[in-house]
Amino acid sequence: MSQRPNPSALIWLLLSALVVGLDQWSKAWVLSSLPEYTPVPVIDGFWNWYRTYNTGAAFSFLSDAGGWQLWFFTALAVGISGLLAFWLSRTARGQWRSALPYALVIGGAIGNVIDRLMHGHVVDFIQWYIGSHTWPSFNIADSAIVGGAIGIAVFGLFDKSDKQQPGTGNLR
């Protein structure tokens, strides 16, 4: 008698789609409503809307590299998203500690890929600062990628469900 396979975590790709949708909706709002390179205060002394563009990666890494970085970061994001989607397909639906961060990274990566392909750069608009110390501008996709990466690291370090139980020789 064959055992029915566990449903995969691919349903979590709906979260990825939600991240992409919110990211693209927010960027459409930014492009239609905010002036370029002009702070619009949200919370004085801490948070502005600030429409800017990034042709590189996090913290504008390689933004002045001459154009090849557009295709490099696009290919990297698509490759990582594909790998994470494959891992989702091999993950049980209830394994949210793996599925949630994978889905967040996929959604964020695809959101920024859409920007790169449509605009040639990523649209950033959230600016946090204290006094004269400003954090680099970012967007919803970036937030999802960072949240997912933190989740992968934290749950990977502290989740013992896949580890061998001491003295039993059996996996949990």
UniProtKB/Swiss-Prot annotation:
Enzyme's top EC category: hydrolase
Family assignment from sequence similarity: Belongs to the peptidase A8 family.
Record localization: Cell inner membrane
A cellular-component GO term for this protein: plasma membrane
Protein role: This protein specifically catalyzes the removal of signal peptides from prolipoproteins.
Gene: lspA
GO function terms (MF aspect): aspartic-type endopeptidase activity
Full protein name: Lipoprotein signal peptidase
Chain segments annotated as transmembrane: 10-30, 68-88, 98-118, 138-158
A Gene Ontology BP annotation from the UniProt entry: proteolysis
Entry EC no(s): 3.4.23.36
Pathway linked to the protein: Protein modification; lipoprotein biosynthesis (signal peptide cleavage)
